[in-house]
Amino acid sequence: MRRPSRRRSKASTPPRSHTTPRRTGPSDSRRRPGTKEQPRPSVQGGTRQAEHDLKVSSPNSESSQYSTSELWSHKVIANYSELFAASVGNVDWLRFCVNPERKEIIVDDKGFTAIHFAAQKCQLSCLKVLIEEYKYPVDLPTNKGQTPLHLVIHKNNKSDILPCIDYLLKKGAAINSQTYNGSTPLHLASCNGLLGCIKLLVQSGANVHARDATGFKPIDYCRLWNHRTCARFLKDVMWKHDKKVLAQEMEKLRTLKEKLTILEYHYLVEYQKEHQILREAHFRKWLQNKVLAQTLGSADSKQKAGVQPWSLASNTLRCPITESLHYPSVEAQLKNLPSPVVPPKPIYKQTTISRPKLWNYSANPARSPITNIGHPQNIRLGVHPEPYKEHDFRRFLEVTRNKHGGACLRTVDRQLVTPVPQLPFEMMVRVLYPGTQPYRMKVPQGLYPRDILKVPEKRHVGDTCSNTMAMTLRETFDKPFLDSLEVCRTRVAPPSK
């Protein structure tokens, strides 16, 4: 027996409530009485505030359900409208959607806001409205650390990129800001081969030596993607930047040398004072011992002659001992020292050099030619090196290599010298220790001794013959020539006829 199928009418039973998250469009507001509305997740372009559960107490609250769903739909549409208006570039629609009394900036699930969508589509008018009227931060990052300046740089809309970059930089955008993978705006411009963007960023102060998480510089991406014009430009800029930085660091090193010279002078003065005090103390001790020994010796001789020793010792020791106790101090001596007199410079008379007359080019046979055509010797014939003019700090300064390849400076009294110019260790040693450098011409760095057994040799001449040259120089291959080639190959002589 066939069962009759049960059909539910829409008027009699309400539809089932779905627990799936709602989409952006308006949803059905009819719900089963007594059920709870599921919490909606954050929609793309929606706020990040938590939504409370809406409870329906009875079927009579249908009007409240309609109002709640309509309110939610209007909120979602408004959020989407703000982001979409910024992406499209409709300024009037954007002003209508953005709430000037907002407390939080509307962000989607990827961290994008209206200013990010406007920058991604190069909508300069929307950028001006959001930054100037609604005070959006210029360096607002996304979830991946991308700022509007990062999003502006792409291959699309190349004509609109430069005005947007120029405007963001004038509003104070960080030109060297990095994403989570370490990319700067200059890295992105180098990847896309945008020469105009690269020039604008470099002129605004972008770091051409910045490295990303993989250790690549902007010029490395130009080489990877075969952007030759951009690579040449960056190479020239990097060379000029390195030369400028080197000149600045060398100027710092020159100032440091002047300070080290003054510091060394004060150290030597104090060192000389200490040694002078020690020498005077040793001299007093030696003098007292010597006078005492002489006194005791004379006392013994007088005692043998009948003179009391104590009277002789009192007369002889009174004068030198009192004089030694009242010896002037080193400081007083230094104050009493006369100022050093600079010896007058000798005055030399300027000697006139008599040079021989030039060769007589005239063809007069009656005049005898000039044979004395010697010239004074200007080449130094000495074998000893010339004294270097720069001051050498080897006796006062200790230069060691740090972990970054630079130099660490310490004086002889173990004081650390800071700050130190950011120069290579070899350059610092060459400037601070000029006496350690060779005075002769340096040999090429590639000239080093090699083992003679590893030098490639020519092939020894033997019975083997090479047919390459013979076949190259020959115009025709006749029968005797082919027979000789066959003999060389098989080493069997042809039968004689």
From Swiss-Prot:
Modifications the protein undergoes after translation, according to the UniProt entry: Phosphorylated during mitosis.
Location(s) in or outside the cell: Cytoplasm, Cytoskeleton, Spindle; Cytoplasm, Cytoskeleton, Spindle pole
Oligomeric form and interacting partners: Interacts with PSRC1; recruited by PSRC1 to the spindle during mitosis.
ANK repeat intervals: 110-140, 144-177, 181-210
Coiled-coil positions: 239-264
Regions of compositional bias (Basic and acidic residues) in chain numbering: 28-39
Main localization (coarse): cytoplasm
Biased composition regions of type Basic residues, renumbered to the chain: 1-10
Region annotated Disordered, chain positions: 1-65
Low complexity bias spans: 12-27
Function: Required for normal progression through mitosis. Involved in chromosome alignment and cytokinesis via regulation of microtubules polymerization.
Short name of one Pfam family: Ank_2
Record keywords: ANK repeat, Cell cycle, Cell division, Coiled coil, Cytoplasm, Cytoskeleton, Mitosis, Phosphoprotein, Repeat
GO CC terms: cytoplasm; spindle; spindle pole
UniProt-listed PANTHER family: ANKYRIN REPEAT DOMAIN-CONTAINING PROTEIN 53
Biological processes annotated in GO: cell division; mitotic metaphase chromosome alignment; positive regulation of microtubule polymerization; regulation of mitotic cytokinesis; regulation of mitotic spindle organization
InterPro entries for the chain: ANKRD53 (IPR042335), Ankyrin_rpt (IPR002110), Ankyrin_rpt-contain_sf (IPR036770)
Superkingdom of source: Eukaryota
Name the UniProt record assigns to this protein: Ankyrin repeat domain-containing protein 53
